Every structure is written in C-alpha cells, then in structure tokens.
C-alpha cells in the first residue's frame, strides 16, 4: 500500500461505514413510509449522508475535487430536488401513497432478502473497496431496494424518489470503489443529468396529473399488446 | 419386322365380319337359356344394314362433337383390334402399339362416346356418361394390373411378343399367376362390354341403363357405327382373353391351311367364352351401381394376387 | 459441333434477358397509357422468349451434354455474390419450356390484357409478367446458390404480385398470402439445404456441388435431401404441401395461371432433379421409394379432388398436382434405378418424367388459356353456369378438346407418349431388384392407370359440361368467340401438343444431352425400333408404339365408313329435332346433368376420403310431394386443409393471443421483468 | 479543422437557432442544412478513418474508430431524411390543428439535441461521457414522445422515461465498476485514465470479476435502452405514440446507438474474459427477442406497434449475429444495422402519411384498400416492407444470408436454423398484416389524397440509397465495415 495517508484512515473508514449504514436504514424507512412529504425528507437525509461521505473522502484523502462533488450533492440533492418535489406535491396536493402492492411487513421481508443478495454479490470485491467495509454491498443493496421500491409504489412521485435512491446507490458505489470518485467532468455530467432527469420527470408527472386527474401509474394501462 | 398390307386387310375384314356375329350369338344363346326363342344369330347384321340406310335425327342442342363421336368409337375399336393377334402370333399392327396403345385407343373411344352422350342435353345421356366413366375408371387398375402380370412374365407389352412367349412356354395356363389374371380380365371384360351384372345391354329402363343411355339420342348410321364399334370392342377384348391365355393354337406359318385351322379354333374359343358370358349373365342379377366397385376391386385383388404369385413362384 | 456455338446461345440468352428488363421498365413507364403498355410489355416478353427458345433449342440440338463454362451476367459489387450463369443440358431443357410458353402466352396476352385496360393498371401486370419470366429463366441458369436463391425469391415475389393482381376480392388476397407464406417456408428449407452443401464444400458454386453428396456424412446428406424435397415440393405442389396451389392458381389472371401451372411449379421439378441427380451423389434406395410414393399419392389424390371441383380453373389447378405426381413417379423410378445401377433404365424413367414435364407445361397452359377465353366470354368460373359454348366459341372448344384429350393421356397425343414411357420404365423396373420393393412398380403402374382413367372422366365432365349441351345461364347464352390473338396463342400450344404427340422419337433426341449429363446414357438411339417413327421401350424386347402410325392407320380405316355411307346412306337425310324430354314440352337447362351430378358416383365410391355432406332445401305450396323449388348443394372436405393446416393455424393464433398478455400495460410488471432479468444474470455471472 | 467536435457542435448550433425562429419552413430548412452538413462531415470522417485508422481530438476527449465512423454515417443519413420529412409532416399536423407552433419548434430543437447526443455517444472516448450522452438522448426523446401531449403519449413517455432512466442507472453502475477495474487494486494520487483508447489496451490486465459484473449491469442497462427482450416493453409504446419522424429516429438509429454502447462493453469483456460469456448473452437474448417479436407481429392491431416489433426482431437479429462472434456473422450484423437504418424510417414515414390520412393507426380502421387512397405511399411502403422482411433484391436478404451462412460455416448449425425460423415467422406476420390493410377495396370511400407526393423525397432518398447499396457496396465502405467488424470481434 503506497497510499499517502495523513489522518488516520481507520477513522475515515469507520465514519464512511457509519454513514453508509445510515443510508441503508433510511432506505428501509423509505420502503415502509407512505407519507409523500416524509419520504422526500428521508431522501434528503440520505443524500446528506452521501455528501457527508464525499466530504470525508475529500478530507481524509486530500482529493480536493471530491469537495466539489460533495458540495453539488448538498446543493442539488439535499436542497434543490427535495424543494422541487415538495412544490410538485403541494401543487397537485396529494399527501400520501395509496396502498402499495405489497404491505409493509412483506416489503421489509423482501428488502431483507435483497440486502442479503447485495452482500452476496459484493462479497468477492471486499478486497477491492478502499474505504469503509461493505460500502459496495450497501450500494448494491440501495440499487436493489430502490428497484423494489419502484415496483412496489404506484404514485409517480414516489417512483421518482425510488429512482433517485438508486442514483444515490451509484454515487456511493463510485465513492466506495474508486477512492477518488470518477473524473470530475464525468461527475459533473452525471450530476446535471440527474437534475435534468428529475425536472423532466417533474414535468411529466405534472402533465399526467393534469390529463389523468390522478398520479396512480398503475392506471396507465392503455397501451397493450 | 414390317407391315403386311394383306394381313391388315384380312384382320380388318375379320373384325368387321365377326363382331356382330359374336353379339348375335350371345343374344341368341341367352334367350335360349332363358327358354325364349330370341332373335336369330344374324340379327345384328340386319340391324346394321337397316340403321345405315335410315335418316339421321340430330338433337337441336348437339354440336359437331355429337356427329363425330360414332366414327371415333368405330375407328378406335377397329385400329385397336389390329394390334391383337387373332389368327397368327404376329398381329398385323403390333409394331404400332401393344397392350398400352390398345387400352389407350379404347379409352379414346370411350371418351368420345361419353361426350356424345352429354351433347344432346338430355339427362339420360349425362347419367350414362357419368356412370360409364366411373365404372371404366375403377375397372382400369384391374385391367392394367392383369396386363402387367402377363407382360412381366413375357417382359414386354407387345401383345404379339406376349403371345409368342406364351406360345413357346408350353401350356402356361396352369401358372396360377395366369389363372388369376385371366379371372381378373374376365370381370373387366364384363364391365367394359356392359354386361350383367355391371350393366344390362338389353334394358332401356332409364335408371339402370348405362351404355344404352348414351346411345339414346343416336339414330341412323351414327347409331350403326356406335353399335358396330361396341361389338368390335367386345370382340377385341374377348380375343385378347382367348388368345393370350390359350395361345397354343395360333397359326405358326403362313400357309392357308394353317390359317383355316387357326380360324376355326379361334371361333370355337370365342364361342366357348361367349357361352361363359351367357351363363354369367343368366345366373346373375344386375348389381346396384354402388356395389359394382366391390366386384371390380375383387378383380383388382385377383390381379394383384396374380402379380404376387409371379413374384413368389419364380 | 461447330465451335463458338455456346457463344451464340449465350448471346441470344443475354439479348432475351435484356428484352425482359426492357419490357418490365417500359410497361411501368407507360402504365398510364394502357394499350401502349400492353403492346410494349408483351411484345418485349414475346421477343425475349423467342430469343431464349432459339438459344436453348440450338444448345440442345448441338447436344452439349457438358455445361459450357459459366460467365458473369454483370459484375457483382457485393462480396460472395456472383451473378454468374451457365448453360447446361438440364437448365437448357427447362429454359426451353419456359421460353416456349413465354412465346405463346405473350401472344395470348395481347388480347387478354386488353380486357383490363381502363379497369386495372395493366402496366403492373405487364411488368411483373416480364419479371416473372426473367426470374424463372434465371432460376434455370443460375450457377451458384446465392444467385439461385435471389432469382427464386424474385420469382416468388413477382408471382405473388401477379396472383394478387385482382386484389379487390378477399379470396384473391388470402390466396396470395397463403401462396407466399408457403413458398417462403419452402425457400427457408432450400436455404438450409444449400447451406448444408456450403458447409461441406465451403463454396456456393454449383460446379463444386457436383456429386458433393458422396463426400458428405450420410446423415447430413439425407437431411439435405429431405430439406430439398420439402422446399422444392412446396413449389411443385406435392401432396400434402399442395393446399396453396388450388387456391392461388385460379384467382390469378388466366395467362398468369397458365404460366404458374405450366412453368413455375416445374421449377420445383427442376430443383429436385438438379439436386438429387447432380449434387447429392449416388442415391440410397429410400430416396427413390419416397419420391415414387409421393408421386403416386399426389397423382391419385390430385385427380380425385379435381373431379369434385366445378370451378373450371380450380379443376385445372388440381390436375397440376396430379401431373406433378406423374412426373415424380418417373423421377422416383429413375432414382431407384440409379441405386440399383441400371443407368439405361434410369435414363428411360428420367426422360419419361422430363417428357411429361414439357407435355404438362404445354397442355396445361393450353387448357388454362382456354379457361381464360371462357372466363373472358362468360365472366364466371363456375361450370354449372356454362354449357353450349361449343356452338358459340367453336375454335376455343376445339383447342380445349385437344388439350383435354392430351391431358387424359389418350393416343395419339403427347400425354399418352410420356405416360407410355412411364409405364415402360415401371414395367421393366420389376426385374431390377429381387427385393419385395419391386412390387411398388406394378402397383404404382396400376395407380397410374387409375389416375389416367379418372382424368379422362374429369375432362369428359370439364369439356362436356362447359362446352356441350345447352347453355345453363344468360352469361353462357351471350358468350362470344375470343379475339384473334387469344386464339393464336392457343393455336400455337395446340400445334406443339400435336407435334410432341406424333414425333416423340425426334423430340427425344433433344433429351439426349440431359440424360447423358445426369445418367451418362444416350437414349434416343435405343428408343427407336427399326424405323424412326416407332418408339420402343429400351429393353431387348420392350413394347413398341407409333402414334403417327396409329393416326395414319385410323385415317386409312376411315375410308370404311365413307365407303359404307356411299353404299347405303347416300340418299339418307339429316334432320334437326328436339331432344326427347320425357314428354315435357321443352327441355329445360335445369334438366341437364350438372358437374356435381356427373361426379357423384365417384364421390360416393370414395366417400371415405371426401366425407361428402349435402344440403337440400325444398319449398312446396300445399303438399311436400309437389315441390316448387329445390336447392341442392354438395360439399367435400379437403382432408389436409381441415385436419392439418387449419388446426395448426388455430394453434398459432391461440399461442400468439396468449403471449400478448405479457404486454399488459402495467409498468410495475415491466419493472419486474427487468428486475428478474437482472437477478437471473447476477446468478448466471457469479 | 476540428472534425469531430464540429460533428457534435453543428446539431447543437442548429438547436440553438431553432429555439429562436418561429417559421415552420425556416425551422425545417435549418435542420436540413445542418444534417446535410453532418452527412458531408460524416463522409469526411469516413475517409479520414480509412486512412488514419483512428481520429481523435481535444487530447483524446473525442475519439473515432471505424465503428464510430459507421455509426456517424447512419445517424447523419437518418437524421437528414427525418428532417426532410418532418417539415411537411408537421405543416400538415398544424393545418389539421393537432399541434401548436410552439410544440413544432420544440420538436425541431429537441430533435437536434437528440441527434447531437447520439453523435456524442459514438464519438466520446470516455465511457462516463458516453453514458452521459446516452442519458441526454433519452431525455430529449422522452419529451419528443410526449410531444402530442395525448393521454396515451404521456403514458408511453412515462414508461419510456422510467424504464429508460432505470436502465441507465444500471448502466451507470456498470460504468462505475469498469472505472473501479481501471483504477485497479493500487490507488494512486493521479487520476487513472478512463478513456476507451486506454482501457482497450489494458483490458487483459483488468480485474475479471469486476468486468464480468460490469457487463451484467451494462447488458441489462443498455439492453433496456436498446430494446432487447424482455427489457423491450417500453419500445412499442414509445414508437407508436411518438410523432412519426421521432419513431423513425428511435427505431432507425437510437436503438442501434444503445447497442453501440453495449458493444463497447462487450468488446472490453471479450478482451478481458474471452468471447464466451458476453457472446452467449447477446446470442441468447437476441434469439429470445426475435422469437418474442414474431407472435406480437402476427396479432398486432396497431400499425406503428407492428413496425416497432419488427424493429425489435431486427435488433435481436443483429445481437444474435454479433453474439455468434465469427468475422462473417459480425460483418453481416453490422451491414444489417446499416440496411435496417435505411429501411425502417421509410416504413415509419409511410405510417405517418397513413396516420394523417386516416386519423388512426388501428389496422381495423385503416382497413383494406389503402392502395386506392395513397397509391404512391403504399408503393414505397411495399418496397420497404419487402426489404424489411429480407426479400431480394434488397440488401437485408444479403446481410441475413451472410449471418446465417457465417453461422453454418462456424458449425453453429442449430443457432442458424433458429435464426432462419424466426425470420420466416416474422415474414409471415408482416406479410399477412400488411396485405390485409394495403391491398383490397376500401370499406368507406376516403377522399383521395390531395398531396400524393408528401414525404416522398425522404422515402425516396432512403430507398434509393438502400437499392444502391444493395447492388453496389463500394470497396471503401466494405473496408470500413470489415474494420468495424474487426474491432467488435476483438481483432485490434
């Protein structure tokens, strides 16, 4: 290991693991929580953890450009997106998710299974991850549970949220696996993409709400065969 | 080998002369067997002459096909007859065609006969043609298979060569293949010449007649040639039977004596066969049309057995 | 043979091909000006066919048994594809057939297509007519599998467009689709077959395919044979792959029906011959047995179904199936003889088959042209509405009658000659093998006899009901004779029928190169007994026949009736009078025998096959004994359609409908698909 | 001159310009000029690549090899045809009052962005940038799909964007894993080089398990975007609801661009793990897509969905051809890409004309006898359909036969047979359906089309090119495709 490390890497690693674990917990809460506004807040917190991880990486490993990532995440995913979604929710005044396909206990069970799967998938790569333990596992779990969340929810907004948690998972993986995150240009590109994506989704959600008088995506079944 | 004009003329004359005689004989003997006096044996000759002289009445709906049909029937039967060995092993026209050509020519005649039956737009003619074509169609395989049986043993479809081959092979008749083929051909003969139990040449009852139904609208010389052609066809088929299955007696050389002898024996054989036909016609009733296939398929099976036995006993 | 002779025919062929192209383009360009388009299209096709005819006949006369070196029609700019053609005896023989028909049909079409001018776009008709002829010629000339398949598919495509020319009728559209689908499935089999050869030889060239089968593993060889049998069998319309044929041929314009029944289905025969005699090497016994069996079955069933038809063109289409069967009998026997190493007999059976191929092409085309003329005059294909046409269109009637006699294999016409050859080969086949297999020969011979007799019955019905007696409908009553060009087209084919019938020995010399190429034997010398006018079976003392002789003798004998007339009937008069109508005042057309009635005995005898069912509706005023009107209709069941094709089609639709449930519109379901795929692959990967 | 960057910039510029003008004609004019220029540049690039082998700019930010050049050509050609068609198409829509000027401008802007994104995908050297560009195309096309703002189009757009961005998230995972593999086990101060041109050289040294995992994610992710079954479910919805020009773009190139991205990973994987793993996946899912498409075609009730499923079948064929992984099959597959890109837009344009005439896409409503109403459109559509079902003399017959015979030559007999069976099944479906609507006599009397030549230039351009290249493949183009096939086949 020829990595020049000044501050104690263990500490950083510990902190990162902690934050990652918190992200996972938040994800689980998202799965069971049905109030939309709460969901949005939970997502904001999750993103906050993500930016925290980025900051830690930047601080402990002198990767100055990762600060930028952290900052962007903070601005975009902790403040801007939640604000945007809040506005949307208030505009189309829908407060809570209708009954999901699977009820809470079952979904918890399913997510547990998916977590297990995430660990199985990630196990071969434990040697590869430089920061924290099992962050990769958590990242993959975030992906799978986010996926599950998308399937399980019927409101357009909560599906968007689920998609965003998947994005968080990607970021986590990027940080966890690759020390310094991706090249800055890529990070920026990805970040702005997510922004645009959410706006597009917002527009669509709004239009759907207008023309269908509902946001229940399971009602969108005109196109068949 | 080449053609002898004399032989052709002779055999043509023989066919023309002998054909009405055979039908006359059969009519007469049948009557006798049924305790009737019946028409004299030469009655058919008188009929022909009478018909030839009479006016012709043609249906208003008929077309040219109606008027040419009798000549086609007559000529095909006649030229088919020239391919059959009657007095000598060497048939005058065997070079121009054997069994297959003969069957073909008879079929051509039947083709036009049936058309002639349809042409006057009467229901009877159509009925007759339909039945005629049906029966001949299901008779055909038996006929062909029987011919094949003989032809295979002789290795040729040329009737003269077949006769010759059987001539040399001493007394082939005991060969089971030949017996069965003979039986099959006999049934086919009954069918082709419109005899009981397939058809009744004597009847004019609308729903039972077949051959007569087609002739219903014919008159005068057209009728004459139709009748004559039919009887020639009957003679041809009979002489195939008698000469292929009892060939021993055909004239070996060209001397007049030999010819005379052969002629006498030939006539005797014909009379024998006619007697058989008469007996069959008398002791059997006419079959329903849809029972005829059973009889003919029996003939087919016989021929097939014959074929099988050539296969087995070689 | 003079040198540079192949060059000559090559030049002629190129000119012909170019003319076909010119015809296509010009008739497309002129489609707005109907008559002009007709003139250009069929003028070009006629000339082109004439060029082809000269080329192929000169080639065959010169007797090149070995192919002349292949040359590129035009340089290909796509890799692995070479538009190279070569003329060899087999290709030339079939090319001769297509060119011959091309000439007659073009002449006929001048008058026939005029009827469409203004009603439909004749430009399209002419264009695809030329394309079809072009593609078919190229099929016979192609020198590699790639080019062959291209020509083959273009042929199918243009045939489809011609079949659906009158696409306003639903029947036409569905028939076209059925045809194209089955032909495409067949093409798929051909592709696979050729690819198996390609796998063995790493090349597409027909040169390299020659006798390739001997170097292939037996399993693959048999697989290739079966694939080819299926693929070419679909095109040829063998039972049970025939269902498209009676659907597609009748609905096409009659000149096209003639072309399809005459030539297009023969491309299947060509392919089968090419493959099994040229490519696949020494055949195992079961190939021949299979082909012979299929041939026999097709012949009998084809004619039986034909008898049940009262649609004139469907009847003719079914007869194509029958005749394909007869051709295949010859080919199958030839394969069996090759297996038992009797090259001469193989040559005999092969030439029987090929002879029947050209015969069928000629008289079937003739009959379809006749049917076209009748259709043109009466605007119906239903024989029950015809009758009495012999008086209104005598020339057409005469031509049709000659065609009917020929197809019924009656002497002295060409159908008789080729079936006579088939009989001869079957007869002598009995001696070729000691095994029980040899019983097949006489039995299939008997079936051939049955076929012939039934065909005769069928054409008595076809001609008798259509042309004889009195007209059954107003259409038939005001029918009129066809225009000159249509009569000329039929006349040409009639003349060819007579020539092929009366001068078989002379024609057989044209087949020598083919038999030499495929079996190594030259036949015509062995087939003449003494004089050049007598045809003989090859065996030391096989039968002999001389159609010309029979005709002459019959002519001589006709002096007898004349003489008798002079003797007895000089003074007798001829009277026209009404037919006896059982005492009714006048004979109504309804009292005539109908086509359905004519074939009823056969329907009853073979009811196990036909499963006939009838509907009778009678109306009466006061007592059921005095019926005022009675309506009778009889149907037969087409076993293959109802027992194989329809259930299969239903099954496919059922499956497809079921599968649509996958795309039910719920995004959750779609997400689940992706999710499951991901999980699956994760397991697969780790 | 900066070739690659200008290729990416020109569409952006035209997008910017389009956002300023209002006149429909000017909008169309701008895009036509722009894409004509693109085509010219594409040919230029094609020449440069043939001579230089690889072209790169901005210290390798842009990077073009034979494969990219081939793609650039396809995109440029299809975009040009689309902009040729779009102007007239929207003018008719506007006249019919189904669409506002604002939306029309929106279309032209987004269309240019869409194209720009695709150009960036094929020219980007950095896998991350490639991902970013692909996401950009996805977003642009989503708004295009939703352009008409009908209920159904919104539904389609929603499904498209959800599934699409989910797939792209997965693809992003793949990118991250690849990057991790590039970083390697020994983290160092300097950022590792994440450029394709670098990766492909170090591929054999990369961590095998990571690459494998990356490929799985890339396969599902980019596969979703490329419409491989069973991730294809958004495809028929989007294709049928988008305005016809967009459907043409989606089916003509967009699917193939996603496939291109997938191929990059495939190449990497083959370099690292050998051909077996990724090849098998491509082959299996390709075949699955083909066999899934056939029954849906057979019982389809909507014209554009029918065409969409046929695209699914073609994509499946291309994947299978590449998956068989012999030089001949890959060559055939790439060629097939090209021919399909020239064929499918024609069908969608024709469908557009039919839609505007009959105001419906339901086969039942269009009913029999379109040929009587729109003779020219139907004629061209028939030709294109014949081509799409692989009938000669069109090139797809040739490319299909090449792939299948390649399979035979490589003793992959069963696979080839399956391919052929699927092709025939699709043929039967398309023939049955199109005959049902195109031919025959119309049920109700439609007013014969007033402007029969609408859209003919675009269709004529593509069909002409198709016919030309069916009988004449220039040696240089062959060389290009062969090189591209070499790249895909892993021959450096």
Regions found by a protein language model. Name each.
Chain A
Residues 2-225:
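Alpha-helical transmembrane segments of multi-pass membrane proteins predominantly involved
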């Amino acid at each position: 290991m020829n990595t020049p490390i000044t501050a104690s890497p263990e500490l950083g690693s510990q902190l990162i693991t902690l934050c990652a674990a918190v992200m996972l917990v938040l994800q689980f809460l998202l799965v069971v929580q049905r109030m939309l506004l709460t969901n949005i807040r939970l997502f904001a917190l999750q993103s906050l953890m993500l930016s925290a991880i980025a900051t830690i990486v930047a601080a402990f490993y002198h990767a100055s450009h990762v600060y930028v990532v952290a900052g962007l995440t903070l601005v975009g995913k902790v403040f801007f997106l939640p604000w945007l979604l809040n506005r949307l929710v208030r505009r189309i005044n829908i407060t809570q998710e209708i009954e999901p396909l699977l009820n809470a206990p079952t979904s918890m069970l399913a997510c547990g299974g998916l977590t297990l799967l995430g660990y199985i998938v990630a196990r071969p790569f434990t040697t590869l991850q430089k920061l924290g333990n099992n962050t990769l596992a958590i990242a993959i779990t975030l992906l799978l549970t986010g996926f599950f969340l998308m399937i399980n929810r019927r409101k357009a907004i909560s599906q968007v949220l689920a998609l965003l948690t998947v994005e968080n998972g990607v970021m986590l993986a990027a940080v966890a696996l690759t020390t310094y995150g991706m090249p800055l240009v890529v990070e920026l590109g990805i970040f702005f993409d997510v922004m645009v994506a959410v706006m597009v989704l917002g527009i669509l959600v709004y239009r759907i709400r207008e023309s269908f008088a509902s946001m229940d995506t399971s009602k969108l079944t005109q196109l068949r065969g | 080998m080449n053609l002898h004009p004399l032989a052709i003329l002779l055999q043509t004359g023989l066919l023309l002369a002998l054909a009405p005689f055979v039908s006359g004989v059969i009519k007469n003997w049948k009557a006798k067997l049924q305790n009737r006096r019946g028409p004299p044996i030469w009655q058919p000759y008188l009929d022909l002459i009478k018909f030839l002289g009479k006016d012709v009445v043609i249906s208003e709906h008929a077309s040219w096909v109606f008027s040419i049909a009798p000549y086609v029937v007559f000529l095909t039967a006649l030229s088919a007859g020239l391919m059959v060995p009657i007095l000598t092993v060497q048939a005058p026209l065997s070079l121009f065609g054997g069994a297959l050509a003969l069957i073909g020519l008879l079929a051509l005649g039947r083709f036009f006969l049936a058309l002639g039956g349809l042409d006057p737009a009467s229901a009877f003619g159509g009925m007759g043609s339909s039945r005629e074509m049906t029966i001949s169609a299901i008779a055909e395989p038996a006929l062909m298979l029987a011919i094949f049986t003989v032809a295979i043993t002789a290795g040729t479809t040329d009737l003269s060569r077949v006769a010759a081959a059987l001539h040399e092979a001493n007394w082939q008749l005991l060969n089971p293949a030949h017996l069965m083929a003979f039986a099959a051909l006999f049934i086919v003969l009954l069918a082709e010449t419109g005899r009981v139990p397939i058809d009744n040449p004597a009847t004019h009852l609308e729903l039972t007649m077949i051959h007569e139904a087609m002739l219903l609208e014919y008159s005068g010389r057209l009728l004459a040639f139709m009748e004559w052609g039919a009887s020639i066809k009957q003679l041809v088929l009979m002489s195939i039977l008698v000469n292929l299955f009892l060939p021993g007696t055909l004239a070996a050389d060209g001397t007049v004596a030999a010819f005379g002898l052969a002629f006498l024996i030939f006539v005797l054989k014909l009379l024998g066969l006619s007697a058989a036909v008469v007996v069959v016609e008398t002791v059997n009733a006419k079959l329903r049309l849809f029972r005829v296939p059973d009889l003919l398929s029996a003939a087919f099976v016989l021929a097939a057995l014959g074929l099988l036995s050539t296969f087995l006993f070689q | 043979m003079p040198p540079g002779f192949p060059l000559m025919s090559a030049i002629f062929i190129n000119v012909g091909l170019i003319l076909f192209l010119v015809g296509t383009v010009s008739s497309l360009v002129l489609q707005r000006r109907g008559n002009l388009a007709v003139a250009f299209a069929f003028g070009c096709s006629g000339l082109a066919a004439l060029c082809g005819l000269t080329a192929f006949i000169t080639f065959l006369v010169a007797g090149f048994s070995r192919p002349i070196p292949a040359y590129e029609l035009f340089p290909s700019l796509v890799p692995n594809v070479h538009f190279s053609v070569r003329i060899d005896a087999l290709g030339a023989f079939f090319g001769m057939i297509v060119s011959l028909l091309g000439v007659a049909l073009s002449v006929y079409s001048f008058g026939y297509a005029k009827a469409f001018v203004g009603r439909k776009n004749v430009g399209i008709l002419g264009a695809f007519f030329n394309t079809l002829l072009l593609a078919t010629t190229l099929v016979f000339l192609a020198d590699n599998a790639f080019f062959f398949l291209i020509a083959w598919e273009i042929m199918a495509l243009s045939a489809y467009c011609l079949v659906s020319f009158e696409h306003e009728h639903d029947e036409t559209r569905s028939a076209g689709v059925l045809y194209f689908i089955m032909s495409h499935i067949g093409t798929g089999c051909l592709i696979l077959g050729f690819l198996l050869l390609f796998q063995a030889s790493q090349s597409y060239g027909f040169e390299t395919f020659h006798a390739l089968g001997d170097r292939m593993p037996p399993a693959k060889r048999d697989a290739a044979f079966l694939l080819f049998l299926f693929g070419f069998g679909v095109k040829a319309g063998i039972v049970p792959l025939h269902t498209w044929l009676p659907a597609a041929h009748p609905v096409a314009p009659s000149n096209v029906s003639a072309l399809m029944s005459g030539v297009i289905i023969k491309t299947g025969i060509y392919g089968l011959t090419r493959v099994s005699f040229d490519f696949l090497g020494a055949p195992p016994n079961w190939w021949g047995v299979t082909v012979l069996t299929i041939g026999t079955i097709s012949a009998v069933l084809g004619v039986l179904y034909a008898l049940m038809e009262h649609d004139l063109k469907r009847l003719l289409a079914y007869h194509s199936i029958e005749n394909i069967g007869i051709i295949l009998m010859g080919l199958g026997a030839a394969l069996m003889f090759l297996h038992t190493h009797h090259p001469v007999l193989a040559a005999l059976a092969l030439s029987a088959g090929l002879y029947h191929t050209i015969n069928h092409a000629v008289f079937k085309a003739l009959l379809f042209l006749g049917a076209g003329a009748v259709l043109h005059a009466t605007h119906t294909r239903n024989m029950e509405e015809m009758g009495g046409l012999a008086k209104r269109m005598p020339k057409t009637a005469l031509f049709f009658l000659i065609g009917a006699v020929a197809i019924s294999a009656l002497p002295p016409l060409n159908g008789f000659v080729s079936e006579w050859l088939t009989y001869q080969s079957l007869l002598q086949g009995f001696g070729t093998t000691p095994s029980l297999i040899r019983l097949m020969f006489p039995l299939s011979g008997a079936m051939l006899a049955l076929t012939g007799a039934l065909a005769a019955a069928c054409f008595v019905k076809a001609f008798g009901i259509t042309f004889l007696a009195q007209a059954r409908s107003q259409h038939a009553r005001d029918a009129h004779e066809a225009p000159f060009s249509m009569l000329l087209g039929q006349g040409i084919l009639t003349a060819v029928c007579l020539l092929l019938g009366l001068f078989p020995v002379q024609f057989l010399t044209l087949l020598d190169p083919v038999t030499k190429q495929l079996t190594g034997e030259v036949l015509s010398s062995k087939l003449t007994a003494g004089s050049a006018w007598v045809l003989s079976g090859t065996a030391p003392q096989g039968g002999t026949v001389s159609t010309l002789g029979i005709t002459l003798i019959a002519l001589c004998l006709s002096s007898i009736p004349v003489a008798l007339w002079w003797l007895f009937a000089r003074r007798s008069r001829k009277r026209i009078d009404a037919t006896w109508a059982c005492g009714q005042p006048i004979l109504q057309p309804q009292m005539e025998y109908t086509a359905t009635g004519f074939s009823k005995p056969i329907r009853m005898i073979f009811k196990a096959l036909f499963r006939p069912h009838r509907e009778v509706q009678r109306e009466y005023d006061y007592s059921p004994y005095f019926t005022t009107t009675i309506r009778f209709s009889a149907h037969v069941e087409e076993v293959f359609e109802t027992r194989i094709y329809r259930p299969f089609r239903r099954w496919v639709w059922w499956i497809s409908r079921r599968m649509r449930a996958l795309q039910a519109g719920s995004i959750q379901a779609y997400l689940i698909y992706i999710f499951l795929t991901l999980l699956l692959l994760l397991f697969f990967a780790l | 001159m900066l070739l690659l960057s200008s290729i990416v910039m020109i569409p952006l510029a035209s997008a910017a310009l389009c956002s300023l003008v209002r006149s429909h004609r000017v909008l169309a004019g701008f895009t036509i000029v722009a894409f004509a220029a693109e085509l010219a540049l594409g040919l230029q690039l094609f020449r440069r690549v043939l001579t230089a082998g690889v072209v790169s700019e901005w210290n390798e930010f842009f990077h073009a090899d034979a494969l990219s050049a081939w793609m650039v050509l396809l995109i440029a050609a299809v975009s040009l045809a689309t902009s040729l068609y779009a102007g007239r198409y929207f003018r008719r829509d506007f006249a019919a009052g189904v669409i506002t000027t604002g939306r029309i401008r929106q279309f032209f802007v987004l269309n240019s962005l869409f194209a720009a994104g695709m150009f960036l995908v094929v020219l980007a050297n950095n896998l991350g940038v490639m991902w970013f560009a692909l996401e950009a195309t996805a977003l642009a096309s989503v708004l295009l799909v939703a352009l008409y703002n009908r209920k159904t189009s919104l539904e389609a757009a929603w499904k498209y964007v959800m599934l699409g961005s989910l797939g792209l998230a997965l693809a992003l995972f793949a990118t991250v894993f690849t990057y991790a593999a590039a970083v390697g086990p020994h983290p160092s101060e300097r950022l590792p080089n994440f450029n394709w041109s670098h990766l492909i050289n170090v591929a054999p040294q990369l961590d095998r398990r990571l690459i494998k995992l990356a490929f799985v994610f890339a396969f599902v992710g980019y596969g979703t975007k490329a419409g491989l079954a069973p991730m294809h479910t958004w495809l028929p919805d989007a294709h049928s609801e988008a305005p016809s020009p967009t459907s043409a773009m989606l089916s003509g190139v967009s699917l193939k661009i996603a496939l291109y991205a997938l191929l990059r990973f495939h190449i990497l994987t083959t370099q690292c793990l050998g051909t077996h793993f990724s090849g098998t996946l491509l082959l299996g899912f390709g075949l699955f897509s083909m066999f899934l498409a056939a029954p849906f075609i057979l019982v389809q009730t909507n014209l554009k969905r029918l065409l969409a499923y046929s695209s699914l079948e073609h994509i499946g064929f291309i994947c299978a051809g590449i998956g068989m992984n012999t030089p001949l099959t890959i060559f055939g597959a790439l060629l097939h890409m090209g021919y399909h890109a020239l064929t499918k837009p024609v069908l969608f344009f024709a469908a557009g004309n039919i839609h505007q005439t009959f105001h419906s896409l339901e086969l039942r409503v269009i009913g029999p006898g379109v040929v009587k109403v729109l003779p020219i459109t139907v004629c061209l559509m028939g030709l294109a359909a014949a081509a799409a079902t692989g009938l000669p003399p069109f090139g797809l017959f040739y490319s299909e036969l090449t792939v299948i015979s390649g399979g035979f030559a490589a003793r992959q007999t069963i696979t080839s047979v399956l391919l052929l069976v699927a092709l025939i099944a699709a043929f039967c479906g398309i023939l049955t359906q199109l005959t049902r609507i195109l031919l025959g006599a119309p049920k109700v009397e439609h007013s014969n089309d007033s402007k029969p030549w609408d859209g003919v230039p675009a269709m004529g351009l593509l069909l002409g090119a198709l016919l030309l290249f069916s009988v004449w493949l220039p040696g240089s183009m062959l060389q290009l495709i062969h090189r591209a096939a070499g790249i895909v086949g892993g021959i450096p």
